[in-house]
From Swiss-Prot:
PROSITE patterns noted in UniProt: HIT_2
Gene: HINT4
Activity regulation as described: The adenosine 5'-phosphosulfate phosphorylase activity is enhanced at low pH.
The keyword Endoplasmic reticulum is assigned to this record: no
Protein name: Bifunctional adenosine 5'-phosphosulfate phosphorylase/adenylylsulfatase HINT4
Length: 146
């Protein structure tokens, strides 16, 4: 799970950020605009460490803290860039993820065009899209220190 995957497009952005306009960078994550935006604003927040999918997250303080930090970064970006919009945050779950590198979708709604909302629906037990807050509840450590 740790480190960088040489074949991963998001790991390439982490290694060589000059190819992408970064909206945020810190020791844990980077953020940039989705190349195929589905909303008025559509940003991605990714960990610098290669974590393939939400299924690789566990009820551990470090995983919970990472996702909470990703959400905080996304919220700050959208509050700054689209404060009047409704915001939505979440992750695709396998097999519906397009890139095998954990990434938080951050939306300032509405979806553009409107039909793109279909891509970001929960499919219940089949997976689909999971809201960031729902994922946080799912991975919250049982004896949380955070």
């Amino acid at each position: 799970m740790a480190g960088v995957n040489q074949a991963c497009i998001f790991c390439e952005i982490v290694r060589n950020p000059t190819t992408t306009r970064l909206l945020h960078t810190d020791e844990k994550v980077i953020a940039f605009q989705d190349i195929k935006p589905a909303a008025q604003r559509h940003y991605l927040v990714i960990p610098k460490e290669h974590i393939p999918t939400v299924n690789d997250l566990q009820r551990r303080d470090e995983d919970y803290s990472l996702v909470r930090h990703m959400l905080s970064v996304g919220q700050q970006l959208l509050q700054k860039d689209a404060p009047q919009s409704i915001h939505r945050f979440g992750f695709h779950q396998p097999p519906f993820n397009s890139v095998d590198h954990l990434h938080l979708h951050c939306f300032a709604l509405p979806y553009v065009p409107r039909w793109k909302a279909i891509k970001y629906k929960s499919l219940g037990p089949l997976g689909g899209f999971i809201e960031a807050e729902t994922l946080l509840e799912k991975i919250r450590p049982l004896l949380s220190k955070v």
